[in-house]
Every structure is written in structure tokens, then in C-alpha cells.
């Protein structure tokens, strides 16, 4: 593979910083968008400076300044956006990026901010969590209407949020004595190491096999059930947890009285652990769908038993 010019938008975020790192490690000429407000956040600014030390270029631009976005986009072949999906306003900022890419006319690949569940499959998702998927589809429509070459990334469950705490609501650390099992705990889920998400994402940018397609992440050994995840931790830690199965009705009842952010989390967990939305369909090449670990078998992805070791 050759050397690409890659612009990462949202490069100081949870997944964005890993994509910047992966891009640099793969030898690409890496640019990171520096928004004016970043200079007010010492941690983000220091992170940007660390990227610069590693050879990345910092490009000043603002979503409120169309011309600055166009200038930034004209510097590169590939644009990867990783702005947070936690706020609807952030997701729709990508429409400004789409307009800049359309005007610049030089981008060979755009990867918008998705990286979780495939929004195209979540049209019947529960409110208020459905809004995130709906807005991602608005961005997809804009991309496709503008005929922008793209790849959509469905990376499923990030380990930091779903694995270390055994997918429990609340703290991000493993429970010490009790664990709630969602349903019977036998629905298949896909868990990912965040660095592997970044690696697979960067590997797509010059690969014609992923052009204008959705790439799902299903490394075989990371497609496991909730119960298997819990048992993996028990084996590693030597600590048997008291397990309580929670029915779908009782789980959804947890939404009552919660704020919107908590309701969104509960709704998403319901789709993952009760409906099996990550694995209840086949990946279909005829529908412009591909699977990451099959395309890139050379990637030695992190298994969840190894991911959990840091929590011991």
C-alpha cells in the first residue's frame, strides 16, 4: 500500500486519537484538524502537540468557517471523522464537512463518524436512543447525494465501555461480587479492542474492496455471549460472581425516572443484548457489506481474555 494523505477530524477524542496513531504508524501523511476551541483545553492541546512530535500536521479550521474546511480538505486524499456521537449537534456538524468535501472535489475516501451499531439497521430503535441512528443516516444521505466515495464502519462494542465492567450499568470497572446477566446471557455480541478498530479503519482507506461499502467488525474469537464474557473474567480473576438474570421487561423498566443520557444507554444495551442487533443478520456482499477480519487476516486482533488482563 502507498502513502496516503489523511485528515482526521476529531483526532483528540476517544477513538480519534487512536486513528491518528494508526495512520502515522502505517506511514501515511497524517493531518489533524485543530479547531479554535481546542486551544482552550490544555489536555487536548497537549495531545495535538504530541501528534505533531510524531510527524502529524496540525491544520487549523472551524466548522463555522466553510472556506477553512475546504482548504483543509484540499490537502488530503482521505477524510476520517470521529466527532462524538454523544451530542446530536456534533453529528450534524459533519454536514458542513460533506459540503467542504463536495466543493474541494479531491477526496478519494470519506469515513464518517459511526463506529458503533449500523444505523441503517436501527430504524426501529427505541427512543430516545434512535435519534443518534437517525442523524447518522442524515449524514449518510448527504454523502451519497454528493457522490462522495466512502466507507461506513460498524465496529460494534468498544472494550473500554463494554468489556472491563462486564457491560454493567454504572462504573467502568469489573464488579466484585454480583453481576447482572441480560436475558439468558446467550445472545452473541461483538467486542473490540479500540486500537484494533483504528488499525482496521486505516487499512480500508486504499482498499477498493471497501469502497462505498459498510465494513462490519466480527473477529471470530470476539463474537461471544454476555455469559461467556462474564465467565472469561471469572476464570482470569478466580472470583465467582453471583449472577442474576434480568428479563427484557425488567431491563426496559430501568428507563423509568432516568435522564435522557441514561435512557439512551439502556435502549442501546437492550438492542445489543436482548435483540442481538450486532449479530442477528448475515453480512451480504451483494448488499455492499464486508467483514474486517476476513479482509485483513494478517491483523493479530486482541481477544477479550487478553483485553481483560489489565483489569486484574
Swiss-Prot record:
The UniProt induction remark is: Up-regulated by abscisic acid and down-regulated by gibberellins.
- Protein's UniProt name: Bifunctional pinoresinol-lariciresinol reductase
Q: Per the similarity annotation, which family is this?
A: Belongs to the NmrA-type oxidoreductase family. Isoflavone reductase subfamily.
Q: Where is the active site?
A: 136
On the tree of life, the source organism's domain of life is Eukaryota
Write out the residues that bind NADP(+): 10-16, 35, 44, 140
- Keywords in alphabetical order: NADP, Oxidoreductase
Reply yes or no: does the keyword Oxidoreductase apply. Answer: yes
Amino acid at each position: 500500500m502507498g502513502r496516503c494523505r489523511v485528515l482526521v477530524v476529531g483526532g483528540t477524542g476517544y477513538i480519534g486519537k487512536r486513528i491518528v496513531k494508526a495512520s502515522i504508524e502505517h506511514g501515511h501523511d497524517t493531518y489533524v484538524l485543530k479547531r479554535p476551541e481546542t486551544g482552550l483545553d490544555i489536555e487536548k492541546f497537549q495531545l495535538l502537540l504530541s501528534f505533531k512530535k510524531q510527524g502529524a500536521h496540525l491544520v487549523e479550521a472551524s466548522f463555522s468557517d466553510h472556506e477553512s474546511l475546504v482548504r483543509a480538505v484540499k490537502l488530503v486524499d482521505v477524510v476520517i471523522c470521529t466527532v462524538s456521537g454523544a451530542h446530536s449537534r456534533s453529528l450534524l456538524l459533519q454536514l458542513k464537512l460533506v459540503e467542504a468535501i463536495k466543493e474541494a472535489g479531491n477526496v478519494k475516501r470519506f469515513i464518517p463518524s459511526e463506529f458503533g451499531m449500523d444505523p441503517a439497521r436501527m430504524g426501529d430503535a427505541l427512543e430516545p436512543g434512535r435519534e443518534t441512528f437517525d442523524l447518522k443516516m442524515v449524514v449518510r444521505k448527504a454523502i451519497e447525494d454528493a457522490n462522495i466515495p466512502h466507507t461506513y464502519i460498524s465496529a460494534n462494542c468498544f472494550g473500554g465501555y463494554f468489556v472491563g465492567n462486564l457491560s454493567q450499568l454504572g462504573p467502568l470497572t469489573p464488579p466484585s461480587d454480583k453481576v447482572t446477566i441480560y436475558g439468558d446471557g446467550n445472545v452473541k455480541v461483538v467486542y473490540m479492542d479500540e486500537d484494533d478498530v483504528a488499525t482496521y479503519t486505516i487499512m480500508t482507506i486504499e482498499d477498493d474492496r471497501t469502497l462505498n461499502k459498510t465494513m462490519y467488525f466480527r473477529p471470530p474469537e470476539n463474537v461471544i455471549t454476555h455469559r461467556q464474557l462474564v465467565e472469561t473474567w471469572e476464570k482470569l480473576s478466580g472470583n465467582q460472581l453471583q449472577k442474576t438474570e434480568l428479563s427484557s421487561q425488567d431491563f426496559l423498566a430501568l428507563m423509568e425516572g432516568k435522564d435522557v443520557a441514561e435512557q439512551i444507554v439502556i435502549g442501546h444495551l437492550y438492542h445489543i443484548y436482548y435483540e442481538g442487533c450486532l449479530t442477528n443478520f448475515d453480512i451480504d456482499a451483494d448488499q455492499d457489506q464486508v467483514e474486517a477480519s476476513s479482509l485483513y487476516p494478517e491483523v493479530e486482533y486482541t481477544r477479550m481474555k487478553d483485553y481483560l488482563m489489565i483489569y486484574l
